[in-house]
A protein has these predicted regions:
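Mid-domain alpha/beta scaffold segments of enzyme catalytic cores
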Residues: 1-230
Length: 230
């Protein structure tokens, strides 16, 4: 059994086949969506699965062109416990939309402020410090930092906030990724694929590098999921 806490299976060539095989193996997948309309289209296709979930997302890279979807996000948010992919992206290609990204994220976080029954997967590229500040401001309790690539020094603050990190095989292949992996406490590590966008997404290879078992990841995952019950 593997646990994939960040996968875009709706973007796979054959999503139904992908999640059906995962379900048959007992694998757990939390699917991301990039927009509310994608969640609305995909939700019906995961009904009945025991180990497969779909998250309601609003990707920061699409914020500038997708403001019309925010009302749909507000409507759909009551139908799921899983939120993602949301966040901020201040990398050079998207830095010109910084203000509208922040405005959009504030809108979203205001809808789930203090909600212990939501699990949130966040994108934080080049905006890790700003994103953490907003998550704390809006008292978002259950957060997974997906494919973290920020400063080593901020990891302590993220851990102190009670948050987790989802890590993937690609991180094991770069010097910065390996340094980050060596810094995150093992009890705060979850696994992800980020497929199909990430071409290096073999979760078992990630586990081998980390010297962690599937059971250890499952225990971390259960600790996080159990928070959502209270």
């Amino acid at each position: 059994m593997t646990i994939d806490t960040h996968c875009h299976y709706d973007m796979m060539e054959n999503p139904t086949d992908y999640i059906s095989k995962a379900e048959s193996h007992g694998d757990i997948i939390i699917g991301m969506t990039n927009l509310p309309s994608h969640y609305r289209m995909g939700k019906a296709h995961v009904v009945g699965y025991k180990h497969i979930r779909l998250s309601l997302g609003f990707h920061p890279q699409l914020a500038a062109t997708s403001q019309h979807e925010l009302p749909m996000f507000d409507t759909l948010i009551n139908f799921t416990s899983y939120i993602g992919e949301i966040g901020l992206d201040f990398s050079s290609a998207y830095s010109n939309s910084k203000d509208i990204q922040i405005k959009s994220l504030r809108h979203i976080l205001s809808k789930i402020s203090g909600d212990t029954h939501k699990l949130v997967s966040v994108h934080s590229r080049k905006a890790e410090k700003e994103l953490l500040a907003l998550l704390l401001e809006y008292r978002i309790p259950n957060v997974i930092f997906h494919w973290y690539s920020g400063s080593i020094s901020l990891i302590t603050n993220i851990v102190s906030a009670g948050y987790y990190f989802s890590v993937n095989e690609a991180m094991t292949k770069s010097a910065n990724g390996r340094k980050i992996l060596s810094t995150i406490p093992k009890e705060r590590i979850l696994t992800e694929s980020d497929a199909p966008y990430n071409k290096h997404y073999n979760i078992r290879n990630t586990l081998e590098y980390l010297n962690m078992s599937e059971y250890e990841i499952y225990q971390n995952f259960r600790c996080l999921i159990n928070r959502m019950k209270y």
